[in-house]
């Protein structure tokens, strides 16, 4: 992989309790420990990746990013793990499908956010891995993750 390439991995399964969040946190921490810059996107309205990394309620969340009310740059929060950041989730994600309705491009909102992220980062601080912690369902949030991902775990 080119040092400047950003790899996007979605952690998805329709069943809850199978280890998506645990894998996202542990894989993100391991990648950061070997020098990679990692961003976790918490797409699960339960927000367990966010709370698991010690992030409580923040000004902006993935809901705000996906609805266009905040940029991914503004919503990104540093964690206690060096080189590991997260865009935290809130329960507001439950209303995402209703919020976007039948708007065009609704399946590609997350993918478009990553283009914005790459455009605003300098080479020495470029995110090398994005891990998307998906909700336990095949809904519009998960479809956004799958459309944005290079690979799925």
What is the predicted function of each stretch?
Residues 1-153:
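P-loop NTP-binding core
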């Amino acid at each position: 992989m080119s040092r400047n390439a950003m790899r996007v991995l979605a952690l998805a399964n329709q069943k809850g309790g199978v280890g998506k969040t645990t894998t996202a946190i542990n894989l993100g921490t391991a990648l950061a420990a070997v020098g990679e810059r990692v961003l976790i996107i918490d797409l699960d309205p339960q927000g367990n990746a966010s709370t698991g990394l010690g992030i409580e309620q923040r000004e902006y969340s993935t809901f705000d990013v996906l609805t266009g009310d905040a940029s991914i740059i503004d919503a990104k929060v540093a964690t206690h793990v060096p080189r590991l950041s997260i865009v935290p989730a809130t329960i507001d994600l439950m209303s995402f499908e209703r919020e976007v309705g039948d708007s065009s491009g609704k399946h590609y909102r997350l993918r478009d956010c990553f283009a914005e992220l790459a455009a605003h980062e300098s080479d020495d601080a470029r995110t090398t891995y994005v891990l998307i912690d998906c909700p336990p369902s095949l809904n519009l949030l998960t479809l956004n993750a799958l459309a944005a991902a290079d690979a799925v775990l």
